[in-house]
Regions:
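Alpha-helical membrane-interface segments at transmembrane helix boundaries
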Residues: 11, 15, 42, 46, ...
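Hydrophobic secondary-structure segments that place a key small or acidic residue at a functional site
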Residues: 98-99, 110-215, 239
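Mechanotransmission and gating elements of multispan inner-membrane complexes involved in transport
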Residues: 74, 86-91, 168-170, 177-184, ...
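Hydrophobic, regular-secondary-structure patches
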Residues: 42-116, 123-126, 146-147, 164, ...
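Transmembrane alpha-helical interface segments in multi-pass membrane proteins
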Residues: 6-11, 15, 19-30, 34-42, ...
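ABC-family P-loop ATPase nucleotide-binding domain
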Residues: 1-3
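Short aromatic/hydrophobic contact patches that present stacked aromatics
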Residues: 29, 38, 62, 155, ...
Length: 346
């Protein structure tokens, strides 16, 4: 019996007991579908994060500190980093504190969900690119000025989501309440994502000392301070990072009390984390494929027992052991293949 005949008999066997065949395939269908969904979601998330890092540019440097260290009685503050920018203009072009908070937003009589609030200085907005250090651009209005930050003015720049949701696109000059404190909208950021709640468009920027008074911590849990710096170019980012690390070590006397990362390093770390997570999730999903394969094996063993009469007749007609074994192998392979196709399609 050739392969074509065996394949036709396998399809006939599947058609004869459709429900049994479907239940046998179910493990393969679920397993293949789960692997495809997980890979698709993982790749989508990775691409989304990579696009966000690309918007930031390759010259961004992130600094986080975790305490006073062992060599001094004070932390490094923004004034210390300003000195570095002034001292090494060939490597560094700007620095800003980056304070993360969240606030309940209220406009007139309407309340909105808690929104991410970031405290920054005027240096967060770069005049040469007309955008922020993280790649956002202004749609209208202006960004925070030195006067706004120095005088702790209650002004804010909001994302597209809040501008559309609360103000129907007419936000400039309007006053909103952030956790009970009134702020005047002076700028609106361009849409950068899907403009939904919790997205990159659902943000508010205010002077950093105002955000510190909200008392809700910094960008990363456990950090005392966080700063963003920009190197003059991608080529000088590593050298600029070294300058910053040297200054921090001088104060803390230990690298355990701070962390400095370039945007390229952040992207690499994120990709490594995502790849590890993907491997774990795919391995978990692959277990269902293994279970499906074991299910097909069990059904084939039961089928051999049920079809002893058919096997005997074939042997009496001259079928060899390898022909009968090949028939069951082809049936198992056909069942797996059909289940795999259904898993891909559905």
């Amino acid at each position: 019996m050739n392969f074509t005949q065996s394949f036709k008999l396998a399809l006939k066997s599947l058609k004869t007991s459709k429900m049994r065949a479907f239940l046998t395939m179910l493990g393969i269908i679920i397993g293949v579908g789960a692997v495809i969904v997980i890979l698709s979601l993982g790749n989508g998330m990775t691409n989304m994060m990579n696009s966000q890092f690309e918007k930031m540019g390759s010259n961004l440097i992130q600094v986080m500190t975790y305490g006073r260290g062992t060599g001094g009685t004070r932390d490094v503050d923004v004034e210390d980093l300003y000195e570095l920018v002034d001292k090494y203009p060939q490597y560094l072009t700007g620095v800003t504190p980056y304070v993360s908070a969240s606030a309940k937003v209220r406009y007139q009589t309407d309340d909105y969900a808690r929104t991410s609030v970031y405290g920054v200085s005027e240096a967060f907005f770069k005049e040469d690119t007309k955008g922020t250090m993280q790649g956002e651009t202004l749609a209208e209005g202006r960004f925070l000025s030195y006067i706004d930050v120095d005088r702790h003015q209650n002004v804010c720049v909001i994302g597209d989501y809040l501008a559309q949701t609360a103000f129907r696109g007419d936000a400039l000059g309007k006053t909103i309440s952030l956790s009970g404190v009134p702020y005047t909208v002076i700028g609106v950021l361009s849409k950068s994502g899907d403009s939904s709640e919790g997205s990159a468009d659902d943000v508010i920027y205010i002077p950093y000392e105002n955000a510190q008074r909200m008392g809700t911590g910094t960008m990363m849990m456990g950090t005392d301070e966080m700063f963003l710096l920009t190197a003059t170019s991608r080529d000088t980012a590593s050298a600029a990072k070294g300058i910053v690390e040297k200054r921090l070590y001088k104060t803390y006397q230990s690298s355990d009390y701070y962390m400095v990362m370039t945007s390229a390093e952040m992207m690499d770390a994120m990709n490594t984390m995502m790849n590890t997570m993907m491997i774990v999730l795919v391995a978990i999903a692959a277990i269902s494929l293994l279970v499906g394969g074991i299910g097909i094996m069990n059904i084939m063993l039961v089928s051999v027992t049920e079809r002893t009469r058919e096997i005997g007749i074939r042997k009496s007609l001259g079928a060899k052991q390898k022909d009968i074994r090949g028939q069951f192998v082809i049936e198992a392979g056909t069942t797996s293949a059909v289940g795999g196709v259904l898993g891909i399609v559905f």
